[in-house]
Structures are given as structure tokens and as C-alpha cells.
Swiss-Prot record:
<feature type="binding site">
    <location>
        <position position="119"/>
    </location>
    <ligand>
        <name>[2Fe-2S] cluster</name>
    </ligand>
</feature>
<comment type="similarity">
    <text>Belongs to the bacterial ring-hydroxylating dioxygenase alpha subunit family.</text>
</comment>
<dbReference type="GO" id="GO:0051537">
    <property type="term" value="F:2 iron, 2 sulfur cluster binding"/>
</dbReference>
<dbReference type="Pfam" id="PF00848">
    <property type="entry name" value="Ring_hydroxyl_A"/>
</dbReference>
<feature type="domain" description="Rieske">
    <location>
        <begin position="54"/>
        <end position="163"/>
    </location>
</feature>
<dbReference type="InterPro" id="IPR015879">
    <property type="entry name" value="Ring_hydroxy_dOase_asu_C_dom"/>
</dbReference>
<feature type="binding site">
    <location>
        <position position="228"/>
    </location>
    <ligand>
        <name>Fe cation</name>
    </ligand>
</feature>
<dbReference type="GO" id="GO:0042184">
    <property type="term" value="P:xylene catabolic process"/>
</dbReference>
<keyword id="KW-0479">Metal-binding</keyword>
<dbReference type="InterPro" id="IPR001663">
    <property type="entry name" value="Rng_hydr_dOase-A"/>
</dbReference>
<keyword id="KW-0520">NAD</keyword>
<dbReference type="InterPro" id="IPR043266">
    <property type="entry name" value="RHO_NdoB-like_C"/>
</dbReference>
<protein>
    <recommendedName>
        <fullName>Benzene 1,2-dioxygenase subunit alpha</fullName>
        <ecNumber>1.14.12.3</ecNumber>
        <ecNumber>1.14.12.11</ecNumber>
    </recommendedName>
</protein>
<dbReference type="InterPro" id="IPR017941">
    <property type="entry name" value="Rieske_2Fe-2S"/>
</dbReference>
<dbReference type="InterPro" id="IPR015881">
    <property type="entry name" value="Ring-hydroxy_dOase_2Fe2S_BS"/>
</dbReference>
<dbReference type="GO" id="GO:0042203">
    <property type="term" value="P:toluene catabolic process"/>
</dbReference>
<keyword id="KW-0408">Iron</keyword>
Length: 450
């Protein structure tokens, strides 16, 4: 692998609205590669995308008891996520108001309070400033109520925790919209819901966050060609040969009517899932009591047991693979780097051996050292490396696949649906919403585009 210089490419001081609008042409299917490299665009993303979107922070079962906490990020802003005594969840900026040091330096734990290690300012688990050393002697006029860290809005959807800095943003339910229908394929297969397998894997990829978000949103194309041949070969059951594993062709792709979310899935053919997750997980997902229960809850046998190798992104950076059950956030680290935080969910009432098999197979396939994850990372890193070149950034990328092949009135699947699983309709939706957020000054303007 070529070594990638992750220093930003600074080409200009600012972008005006018309220049940003020209970066993506949905009707022609053209993407300006500068959206993946420009530092000024990235700084605007932090302000207009990451500070105004609902961002995935974790799973409720990672903070079960009062005082349980995890630390994570919203964009590049560090945050603390804490279970409260009343079972609610608080999220606040992990930054002391005195000189800006982290309030909490651990990844996870249980606490009754958080104390800044620099000067000792202390905060309760809701993020309120409660103690200042030498307050009487040195801070006689300090009003502690005015010096708490910034607090985010928090909402959950079927176990997943989301937060948003913007008070004027739509609520999470509205933000997700019909995407909830597709999220339920993983999150609502049983009345017990899901639980997170302990542990979060974290690794850095020197590429722009949008490459990862787009692939999980829209790109079944690479899975049906040559990208993952080595991983498929490694995971084939003994009674299957590569010749028996023709790439599936039957499936659908979903594009959110508004919001940038997207998903895609094969229908009916289990062979690729067998190669990825093995016979035990595939059988659990497609036949027997668990799949029958899922079919009943989800309203159809197809949704409960026939959807294979599904991929999904909730805009901008929440991605997961139902059936494989990896869930991850793509934390941006500049225009040329992303930090991946991934965990695995399972049906809470699944047998222990099934939970263990999900854990084992996800580690083998989609983890920092996973055989499929390595293929994806290699491609993204090499693309980012090539985009260091002036000429490489000067010619648009093609996003025309399956253009004009969507319907808005599918009898089963909501949103804009492509009946060709090999489509870039969801990618066009992701970039259209990215453009919408980058050119809208506030949520009032965004709401007007719905």
C-alpha cells in the first residue's frame, strides 16, 4: 500500500454557495473530487453537516446503570454520554469550561462525577459544574450554572443513541423518516430488541469519510464484482465451490425521499451471506423460530428471512450491515482521514452460541483486521492517495448507474426504490443531501427543502 500524506490540500480561502452547488450534479451523475480533499469544504462540513445532523453515539446497553458512561465524538467534538438516575441519557461536550481540557479521559466506566485533571473543576453526571477549587478565595462572583459544558439534544431509536447540537433541527423520528423501516431489519426482529456485544473496535483509515458513508449507503456493485473475492474464498463452506457462487442479481436499493439515507439488499439468495457469516448465522437469520418471529414482527417473510447482505447509512456517518450486524460511526479527522468506531449488535434473546458466532464472524470479516474490511480500506486509501494529484482532482467522477430506474410507489418498500440492486441512486441521494446541508444557512432553510 502506498503511504498516504494526510495533510490537507488547501486550494482557496472560501467557497460561495454557487461554487458549492456546482460540486455535485445529480441529473448528470457527476461528482467533483474536490469534495473529498479540500480543507475549507471540510471545515464547512463540521459546521453545517456534523453540528446540525443526528449522529450515532452508541447503544443503550453500553450504559445500562446510572452513572455508566462512554466517551465518543460528534464530528471532531469529544462528548460524554451518561446514563442518568431517571434512566434518561445526557450528552455534553467533553471540555472543561476553565481552560478546555477534557472533563473525562477514559473510554468508558461508571462515575458519580467528572473532575478535570488540569485544575480540578468538577461536573456532575448531567454535565453541571458543581465544584471549583478555591472558589471562595478566587471566584467570589462565579455563577456555576453559567459554566457548564455545552449539552446536546439526545434521542434514541430502538437501542441506538443519537445526539444533535442544533436546537432547531427536526426530531430524530422525523429525521430518520422511512429509513426506520430498513433499520428495523436489524433492530426489531424480536420483542427483546438488540444488545451490543461488549467492546468497540477503533481504527484509522487515511481517506475521506464520504467514501465510507457512500459505500455503506449505496454500493452493492463492488460486492457483486471482484472487490471481495479473497474474503469470499476464505469463508466458503466446504461443500461450496466458487463456481457455485454466482453473484446475486435480485434485490433493491432504497434512497430516502429526503435526508440522504440509503440502503440496498439482495433478496432470496443466501450463498453470499453463507460465505460472509457461515452456516450457523445464515441459518439463524433465514430459517427457524428466530426468522419466523422476525417475519411476523416485520410484516412479511421476505423482510424477516429473505433479505441478504443488506447495507445501510443513516446520513451522515451511521452505517451498519443487517445480518452481519456490524454498526459503526465514521468519525471525520480532516478531509483525508476517518476514524472508524465499530461494535456488533445481536438479538437480545438470541442463544449464547448465536451471539458468540456473530461476534466471531464479525471479527473475521468486518473489523480492523477483517478480510472484507481490509479490501474496502485498501480501495479508499488508494483513491485518497491518487487525489493528491492536480489532474486527478480536475475530472469528475461518474455516478450514473441505474439512473432513471427508480419508483416512488413500491407496494412494500417506502422511499425511492431502484429494482436494480446495482444502482447509485442512494449515493446520488446522499450527495444531494450533503449539498443541501452545505448550502443551507440553518434548519429553517433545510425544512423548506423537504
Amino acid at each position: 500500500m502506498n503511504q498516504t500524506d494526510t495533510s490537507p490540500i488547501r486550494l482557496r480561502r472560501s467557497w460561495n454557495t454557487s461554487e458549492i452547488e456546482a460540486l455535485f450534479d445529480e441529473h448528470a451523475g457527476r461528482i467533483d473530487p474536490r469534495i473529498y480533499t479540500d480543507e475549507d469544504l471540510y471545515q464547512l462540513e463540521l459546521e453545517r453537516v456534523f453540528a446540525r445532523s443526528w449522529l450515532l453515539l452508541g447503544h443503550e446497553t453500553q450504559i445500562r446503570k446510572p452513572g455508566d458512561y462512554i466517551t465518543t465524538y460528534m464530528g471532531e467534538d469529544p462528548v460524554v454520554v451518561v446514563r442518568q438516575k431517571d434512566a434518561s441519557i445526557a450528552v455534553f461536550l467533553n471540555q472543561c469550561r476553565h481552560r478546555g481540557m477534557r472533563i473525562c479521559r477514559a473510554d468508558a466506566g461508571n462515575a458519580k462525577a467528572f473532575t478535570c485533571s488540569y485544575h480540578g473543576w468538577a461536573y456532575d453526571t448531567a454535565g453541571n459544574l458543581v465544584n471549583v477549587p478555591y472558589e471562595a478565595e478566587s471566584f467570589a462572583c462565579l455563577n456555576k450554572k453559567e459554566w457548564s459544558p455545552l449539552k446536546a439534544r439526545v434521542e434514541t431509536y430502538k437501542g441506538l443513541i443519537f445526539a444533535n447540537w442544533d436546537e432547531n433541527a427536526v426530531d430524530l423520528d422525523t429525521y430518520l423518516g422511512e429509513a426506520k423501516f430498513y433499520m428495523d431489519h436489524m433492530l426489531d426482529r424480536t420483542e427483546a430488541g438488540t444488545e451490543a456485544i461488549p467492546g468497540v473496535q477503533k481504527w484509522v483509515i487515511p481517506c475521506n469519510w464520504k467514501f465510507a458513508a457512500e459505500q455503506f449507503c449505496s454500493d452493492m456493485y463492488h460486492a457483486g464484482t471482484t472487490s471481495h473475492l479473497s474474503g469470499i474464498l476464505a469463508g466458503l463452506p466446504e461443500d461450496l465451490e466458487m463456481a457455485d457462487l454466482a453473484p446475486p442479481t435480485v434485490g433493491k436499493q432504497y434512497r430516502a425521499s429526503w435526508g440522504g439515507h440509503g440502503s440496498g439488499f439482495y433478496v432470496g439468495d443466501p450463498n453470499l451471506m453463507l460465505a460472509i457469516m457461515g452456516p450457523k448465522v445464515t441459518s439463524y437469520w433465514t430459517e427457524g423460530p428466530a426468522s419466523e418471529k422476525a417475519a411476523e414482527r416485520l410484516g412479511s417473510v421476505e423482510r424477516g428471512s429473505k433479505l441478504m447482505v443488506e447495507h445501510m447509512t443513516v446520513f451522515p456517518t451511521c452505517s451498519f450491515l443487517p445480518g452481519i450486524n456490524t454498526v459503526r460511526t465514521w468519525h471525520p479527522r480532516g478531509p483525508n482521514e476517518v476514524e472508524v468506531w465499530a461494535f456488533t449488535v445481536v438479538d437480545a434473546d438470541a442463544p449464547d452460541d448465536i451471539k458468540e458466532e456473530f461476534r466471531r464472524q464479525t471479527l473475521r470479516t468486518f473489523s480492523a483486521g477483517g478480510v472484507f474490511e481490509q479490501d474496502d480500506g485498501e480501495n479508499w486509501v488508494e483513491i485518497q492517495h491518487i487525489l493528491r494529484g492536480h489532474k486527478a482532482r480536475s475530472r469528475p467522477f461518474n455516478a450514473e448507474m441505474s439512473m432513471d430506474q427508480t419508483v416512488d410507489n413500491d407496494p412494500v418498500y417506502p422511499g425511492r426504490i431502484s429494482n436494480n440492486v446495482y444502482s447509485e441512486e442512494a449515493a446520488r441521494g446522499l450527495y444531494a443531501h450533503w449539498l443541501r446541508m452545505m448550502t443551507s444557512p440553518d434548519w429553517d432553510a433545510l425544512k423548506a427543502t423537504r
